[in-house]
Amino acid sequence: MREKKPYQVLTFHTTDAAMEMESFCKQNGIAGQLVPVPRRLSAGCGIAWRMEAEVYAQYQTVIADCGIEVEQSEALVF
């Protein structure tokens, strides 16, 4: 069985915003990936950006200042 890890999950109102976050993070070397929104959360578009909690802690300010509207930001364990 794989060990569970803490992740930060960002949800968005639109698919465009989710895709913008993916592009922004890749351009800035921020590790993460697009995933379906976990059942515990709800989001307008159904797509979320997931990154390890440590990565989010390191880049939280950069992400907040990037200009992409985030609907929710939740810490979850997968």
Please give the residue ranges for each predicted region.
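C-terminal structural segments of small proteins and small subunits
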Residues: 50-78
